[in-house]
């Protein structure tokens, strides 16, 4: 679980449903869990109305069965909802509505993501070979600098999320780890070796700890 997911799961009266992550980093299998919840809560007479934020055709069967138990289903979408919701799911719901940008901005804001500057590389004459030891030292310095820069760009909400993640886990939270590796690989113009990843993640932890204690 990511730090944000852990924070949500720890909230009162909240059930977090997670599927599995496929090879492309996509989460799958959540729809079936939502359908199961819909059916079971309706069958147990634990709910009378549902607000469903979805557009997937796969949840339609859950809507149908819940309605058979007398539950009213209110389908919610984000503008333009018709472009992201299944037409048959919209037809199945008892009511449909959508939130526009102004409504969403009342409780959500777009977090800026640090984008490393792209440096144009001009063609240049071939250079003399650089000793491997010097190259490794240079890369190690860039890796450490990348970790410091990455942590410096984190917002207070990010630091709080990492703190929550570290209560039950170790290392770099998944939602930060991928970005950290990608930005560092760009700085050294190659993929990191396993030993370099350990250095990077260790420095990340050190820098986050400094910011939290500073």
UniProtKB/Swiss-Prot annotation:
- State the UniProt keywords alphabetically: Plasmid
Q: Which domain of life is it from?
A: Bacteria
The UniProt GO MF terms for this protein read:
RNA nuclease activity
What is the protein name stated in its UniProt record?
Answer: Uncharacterized protein y4oD
